[in-house]
Amino acid sequence: MKDQSPSTIKVLYSENLPVEYNNQSTFLQWFPKVALYPSFLKSHSRLIFLILFSFFLIFTGLDDTVLQLDEGADTFVSTTILKNGYPKHSDGTNYTMPYADIYDGIFVYRTWIPYYLQSASLLVFGQNTFSARLPFAIIGIFSIWGIYSFTLRWTNQKNIAFFASLLLATSIPALLYFRTARYIAIPILLTPLLLKFYITIFDKEKWNPIPLTVVSIIYFHTMYVEFAGLIIGILIHL
């Protein structure tokens, strides 16, 4: 068989393309990445279902009811941050817990992270029921991911991680916490995260203390009583 003449060979690319063309992010280079999406969706199908299912349960009718007593009190404290830059017992007209009005009116009854989180939502989305509950509803979604991630890391069994997360997603008390404009939803997320970073101590690789430290600081400044109980349990386990 005679060799094919160079003049008859069909060139796939135009001769006018620069030499650097093959080094750029072209369609052919992006195509393998796009092809990975179906594989990613398939391997994480359980978690995706849980997130969508939880989103429906948590966000449906989130602002159908007015803020309850404790929700209103905590939201009021958050609104004082918008005025003063830090939480106070009074906005100059209204008061909460007058008997605790010490330290020049600074709110010291509970730690501040939940109030700053809620005040950010009130600042961005306006002072209404939905924005007051929004941060904690979002935390509820992440809590489902948190328990799934921790359980999968601990057991290496997707079925166990799925059912553990499903139990949380369908727990009526948990759903009420996620739909409440108060700090009570945040520890549900921070607990599995803290435990996940804790069990990495026992890995063969060099342990990185930064994730555990960061979550511990956030947890302490969210609800120090629950944080103390969890740390005591961890110390007993060690």
Model-derived regions: residue spans:
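Perimembrane helix-loop-helix junctions
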Residues: Q29, F197-P211, A228-L238
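Transmembrane signal-anchor helices characteristic of membrane glycosylation enzymes that use polyprenol
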Residues: K42-E71, V77, K83-Y86
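Transmembrane-helix signature of polytopic, membrane-embedded enzymes
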Residues: F49-L50, I147-T170, L189
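Membrane-proximal lumenal/periplasmic loop motifs of glycosylation machinery
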Residues: L62-L69, K83-Y115, L123-F130
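Membrane-interface alpha helices of multi-pass inner-membrane proteins
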Residues: I102, A164, Y177, N208-Y224
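Transmembrane-helix motifs of polytopic, lipid-linked glycan transferases
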Residues: L134-T155, L193
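Membrane-interface transmembrane helices that cradle and orient dolichyl/undecaprenyl
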Residues: R153-K158, P192-L212, Y219
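Short acidic/glycine- and proline-prone juxtamembrane loop motifs at membrane-interface regions
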Residues: R179-I184
